[in-house]
């Protein structure tokens, strides 16, 4: 049967292909039992043998200009200052200026000889461990809200599970004492919680937010990890609450939201033993913190996120999303490209390169899919 979809459209509709990770879970009896009292976060084998065991998603909110970062356009440089040589796309009605070449030089890096702009010299030095995809064409979504939803869920229009939710649903979590999907400093705008939500999947698979785009990450906290009650008293309270909730479920029927709430209480209880240590990046050596850029400007905030991301991955978190997000951190540069991108690149370049090198040194990079992406580039 001819579906009328080409390969690229299929990948787009499955949230950049991540939906395939969950196929084994979707077809299995254990996954069908997730909403009826199974163990939804138990680790599961993928449908096909896989190299990657976990995902690190570095999301740059606002739209990094591809032609000023990792996708040089020699013809654009040659035509700098000339009028647009073709009709403007119909979906864009804003005034259009003449062609603008990148103000940054591109250099060849590594044995692979991949070109990277002067904005990212540290990442450039890691280029032999990077696959640069220059052929991707996301969609005709020109507003940040729909574009964010599109890259995070596969649809800018309809409610869909996020990448992390699909991954966790399909593969489960390696550590039952920590959330399987964590989003660091996500924006509360442009789709907000939908960008790390579970949509029609059981709510257990939604992401756990640490911080947000409006708050400096050094002030981000996971609440209720150090309660006043003893573990024994907490256990009694949770067991009582669980029995009452389960009685309600038996009387009223399945309720995904309530089941997720029960699971979240249990997760919060288990997290008290492990999460405080994971969150405490001061346990890292001074040399490691310096390598990431912790304690120095302008790298401190994103360095903290990247270092915590590595600690989470190392502890068995399946999917970690690190967000450079609105409104405090934003790549949107309508009229001030040079200052915007120079400033933002200086904040993320060193931390990302340090994270890649750290993962490689620890033997984690070989089995971690690291994705660096943005919702769209510049035209």
Spans of model-derived segments:
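Ligand-binding pockets and gating/stacking loops
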Residues: 1-379
């Amino acid at each position: 049967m001819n579906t009328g979809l080409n390969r690229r459209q299929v990948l787009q509709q499955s949230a950049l292909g991540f939906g395939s990770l969950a196929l084994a879970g979707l077809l299995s009896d254990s996954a069908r039992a997730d909403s009826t009292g199974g163990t939804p976060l138990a680790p599961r084998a993928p449908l096909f043998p896989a190299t990657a065991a976990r995902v690190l998603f570095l999301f740059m909110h606002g739209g990094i200009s591809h032609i000023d970062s990792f996708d040089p356009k020699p013809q654009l440089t040659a035509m700098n200052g000339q009028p647009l040589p073709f009709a403007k796309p119909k979906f864009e009605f804003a005034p259009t200026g003449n062609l603008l070449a990148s103000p940054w030089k591109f250099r060849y890096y590594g044995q692979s000889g991949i070109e990277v702009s002067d904005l990212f010299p540290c990442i450039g030095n890691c280029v032999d461990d990077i696959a640069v995809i220059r052929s991707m064409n996301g969609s005709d979504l020109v507003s940040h809200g729909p574009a964010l939803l599109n890259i995070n869920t596969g649809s800018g229009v309809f409610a869909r599970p996020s990448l992390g939710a699909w991954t966790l649903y399909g593969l489960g979590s390696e550590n039952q004492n920590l959330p399987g999907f964590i989003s660091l400093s996500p924006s509360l705008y442009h789709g907000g919680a939908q960008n790390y939500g579970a949509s029609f999947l059981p709510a257990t698979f939604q992401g756990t937010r640490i911080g947000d785009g409006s708050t400096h990450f050094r002030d981000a906290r996971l609440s209720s990890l150090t309660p006043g009650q003893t573990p024994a008293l907490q256990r009694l309270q949770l067991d009582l609450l669980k029995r009452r909730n389960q009685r309600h479920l038996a009387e009223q029927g399945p309720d995904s939201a309530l089941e997720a709430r029960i699971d979240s209480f249990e997760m919060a209880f288990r997290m008290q033993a492990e999460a405080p240590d994971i969150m405490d990046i001061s346990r890292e050596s001074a040399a490691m913190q310096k390598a990431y850029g912790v304690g120095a400007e302008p790298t401190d905030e994103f360095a903290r996120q990247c270092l915590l991301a590595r600690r989470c991955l190392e502890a068995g978190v399946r999917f970690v999303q690190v967000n450079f997000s609105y409104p405090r951190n934003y790549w949107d540069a309508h009229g001030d490209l040079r200052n915007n991108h120079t400033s933002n690149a200086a904040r993320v370049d060193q931390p990302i390169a340090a994270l890649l090198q750290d993962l490689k040194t620890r033997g984690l990079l070989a089995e971690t899919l690291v994705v660096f992406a943005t919702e769209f580039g510049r035209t």
